[in-house]
């Protein structure tokens, strides 16, 4: 998400596990079996809570998938920069190409969820906001994969992760670059970025209702402490909850 402060409240092969033995990668980490049939969408109880998580065996090695995922990261960074420029020039951003890249990223995450994360750890630039947006998108897509969500839902999560804070471009620069906690008044202004994001994206033909709902609710919290609507419990929704914790 675009950065702003908030108030305080293989022999011979060098692998991630070999470099960092204390780190368990997503592909290595066991999760609770859901008991669902292969390929079945993650079930939810009436409350919208996922019935469980599932282990999905990677179909590509980390090394193979890094090669495939690297150009996706580069393309996504370039497209995010173009979208930011469009927004700053009061133009409607073109989401079609971004959705194409996100769809490819979803397939990469399904093949091996670790490759994208490792690339984002290594590929750091001065454009923190774009890297951070990609990091959020990668985590929500991987979370969706672990829950057994379908490709369309994971794509919506990825698009929302990349764009959910695009409205911060409409906020005063002094607010975004302030060091330290925001004052109560500044925080009220800061929270308007959600409405700005929705206003910017609602005019885009490729902004799906599911993506917009995730963006609208990703700062909501189940205890009602979030914003902008102070939603509680099931009203937040599973997809927005995923976006809110990543």
Model-derived regions: residue spans:
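Histidine- and acidic-residue-rich, metal-dependent catalytic cores
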Residues: 66-246
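Membrane-cytosol interface segments
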Residues: 1-93
